[in-house]
Amino acid sequence: MEQIVKILSAKYVTHNVRQFRLEKPSGYSFIPGQATELSINIDGWQDEKRPFTFTCLNSDDYLEFTIKTYTDHDGVTNQLSKLNAGDEVIIRDVWGAIEYKGEGYFIAGGAGITPFLAILRQLNNDGAIGNNKLFFSNKTDKDIILADELKSMLGQNAHFTITNQKDSIYDQRRINADFLKAEIKDFSKHFYVCGPDAMVEDISGLLAELGADTESVVFER
């Protein structure tokens, strides 16, 4: 079901990632980690649907999306980068397979952090962060989405890796088999993986090879 909602606010949280807060229709609900298809309520764009993950809590009185904008071509995210409070977007039914199953390891690449933002915020709100660990890979330091909030929630368990900046203040290893073997002590825990398709496929395969139960590896299938 399609519903037209107004943008309440829009702000940049990195150089190319924008956080949108929208009106929340009465009765609209989701589980942290889930997504919806969104389009822009402008002629020619209403049917250009793209999936975006909620980054707010279900208990919030607004909907929030944290969206990486690609301005090098005239797609949906480029159009979204031009919108402001008062403009309208179209949201649809909720879907998604990324859902918290229990304590473990979150492995994210770039904008793949978004489903984990909602999950970690909910756990933090419930006082249930526990010993969950995050491995978050980006090209440069300035690409890290909401680094301060992630550090505040997870403390030493927020682990950032940078792949394309030699003077980074963070770990510069890639998340590969050697990294996983060095950093993960217990492959019987839950794993949550989100990022570019190739990364998700690669890491899911590596985790299985290293002894993770495939039923305990959560990603969008």
What positions do the PLM features span?
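Ferredoxin-reductase
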Residues: 2-85, 139-140
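Absolute protein N-terminus
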Residues: 1-2, 221
